[in-house]
Structures are given as structure tokens and as C-alpha cells.
Amino acid sequence: MSGLYNYNNFSPSRAASPQIRTPSSDVDSQYISQLLAEHQKLGPFMQVLPICSRLLNQEIFRITGMMPNQGFTDFDRLRHRSPSPMASPNLMSNVSGGGLGGWNGLPPERIGGPHGMAMEWQGAPASPSSYPVKRILRLDLPVDTYPNFNFVGRLLGPRGNSLKRVEATTGCRVYIRGKGSIKDPEKEEKLKGKPGYEHLNEQLHILIEADLPIDIVDIKLRQAQEIIEELVKPVDESQDYIKRQQLRELALLNSNLRENSPGPSGSVSPFNSNAMKRPKTGR
């Protein structure tokens, strides 16, 4: 992250008004300045690192609560204000280039300051290129042209690992939507028309979602698109190395499962941890 964001050696303590301090308060002031600078750098990643953000905020409030009132000079750089606009309008498009609507950027995370005030760190302004924006790319799958091709299974891969690798590589979230996105046809039929499942009336498609700094969000979306298009591209079975690779991985996973029975099942895949498991279809 440090290679992408340059804060020009910013030190919040430079704006502090001159006053007499004890050595202890000087140390505290320097520490709170460092904490606030870290909070500034973490800003674009608060959505993906919520625990780090929360712990950092807790430490800021713990330290400021221990300092005397004259030690709040660093908080003079904090002021109560409305969230600032994040970036240009977000894009949602399909592979043919037709726009399907816009997404609003997320407001910056607000933190609680002394005396219960909602405050926002106002140090050196962040570069506009560091603002996170959310964008969605839709890929329609040619199910009419290839009715017998298992697009869903191909994208998911063994234990969902193929999809997890795409997400881990690109930093994007990938969702399977539309008719056939739910494994159980009877369950899918029951869910049709219910709130949140309107997509089941549409053709099978993929949504790629990126919530990243504006200077890299389009690059990551294109990267995910290229990987997925290659992954689900129907090819002759004699040249289908992806299928052979997935079958080989599945055999290894099953072999490892048998070796570890009756205890907890393991996996040779680095993407098989419980922390990475989540449903990809449905709502």
C-alpha cells in the first residue's frame, strides 16, 4: 500500500498550536499523530480491513482519553462536517458496453471523537486517485448457444476454488446470477419473483464487483473479466486443459479427504479455509 499512496511525510502534529507540554504529553502527542496518520492511510481499505480500522479507532480514543485537555491539539485538525463526495459516478455495464445504471460511492468512514462528537480526520487531503469507488461489470453467458455447457460448475471449480482464486487474484467479488444460478431447480422455482431474487427471471450471467481506489478499479475489473472469460470459454474437450486441471484438483481433494477421515477433512488448496467460504449464488 505504501507504494501506491504518498502522503508527503505528513505529520499531523505540525499544525498544533504552540504550547507548553510535559515530556509525557509530548510522547502522547507524537503517538496520537502517528495513529491519526495511520488512520489516514488506512482510509481506502476500511471496507476490506474493518477489524484493523476498528482497533485503530479504539486505540486513538483510548490515548486521547488519557491525555489532558491541552493535549488535544492534534484533534484541532479534526472537524465536524458532512461526508465529502468520493469520486466520479460509478459504472455498471455489460460486455456489449450498454450501461445498466450507476452506483454511488461509499461515504468515508466517520469516527467518534471526544464528548461523543462525530469527527473526521482532516489531515493533508488524500489524492483523488485513492478514493474507493464501487463498480459492477456484467458478463452474460451464452447459454442459448451452448445449452449443454456447465458454465456454473466451470466457474466455481472444485469446492469453489476456481472462483476463490479469481477473487484472491483480482480483489473483486464475483457473483453468479440469473436462471440456473441456484443448484436446486425446485428451490429456484420457489424463489422466483421474491424480493432479492428478481435476477432469476434473467439469463444466466456473472456480476463482477470491485470496491477499490479509483486509479486501479478499472484495471482490476478488466483483469477479472479476462480471467473469467477464459475460464468459462467453451472449447473442444480434447483441448480443454482447464477441465483436466479441475478434475485433477478434485481428485487430489477427494484423496486428501479420504486420508484424513474420520477426522476433519483437509485440502491441498490454499483457498479451502472456512474464512473464504461463502455462497456465490442466489441473492
Curated annotation (Swiss-Prot):
Transmembrane segments: none annotated. The modification Phosphoserine is found at residues 261, 269. Gene3D superfamilies: K Homology domain, type 1 (3.30.1370.10). Residues 256-275 have a biased composition (Polar residues). Residues 256-283 are annotated as: Disordered. The keyword Calcium does not apply. Residues 140-207 form the KH domain. GO terms for cellular component: nucleus. The modification N-acetylserine is found at residue 2. Pfam families: KH-I_KHDC4-BBP (PF22675), STAR_dimer (PF16544). It is found in: Nucleus. Signal peptide: none annotated. GO terms for molecular function: RNA binding. Keywords: Acetylation, Nucleus, Phosphoprotein, RNA-binding. Its main location: nucleus. It comes from the Eukaryota. PANTHER family: GENOME ASSEMBLY, CHROMOSOME: A05 (PTHR11208:SF92), RNA-BINDING PROTEIN RELATED (PTHR11208). This is KH domain-containing protein At3g08620.
